[in-house]
């Protein structure tokens, strides 16, 4: 197992997202998504990839666990699914993102930055 986490940062403050990925040599990924003005642990998602029932590609099942009152699990699930489908591995993501008084547009930007960080990671693996 590679003990070095790979770190990717996307976006401008206060909407910066950092993705840290720990690889296990093809046996799963563990990732931590933080950002905004107050990184923390707010939610966890586990994505398990599997073949689609129609045989046309890959899908995944995503389980979620959130800290009460936190919505970070939505970012965790989004990133876990994208990583699982991109890497064809089981993925566990912990997320904690906070921006004071974030608007709907601010939250959308944070989510887009999280997906962009996943894209940067996946492209680094190509």
Residue map of PLM features:
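Generic structural signal for short, solvent-exposed loop/turn connectors between secondary structure elements
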Residues: 1, 124-126
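Extended amphipathic alpha-helical scaffolds
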Residues: 1-7
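Conserved mixed alpha/beta catalytic, RNA-binding, or beta-rich assembly cores of soluble enzyme
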Residues: 9-86, 90-100, 106-114, 120-124
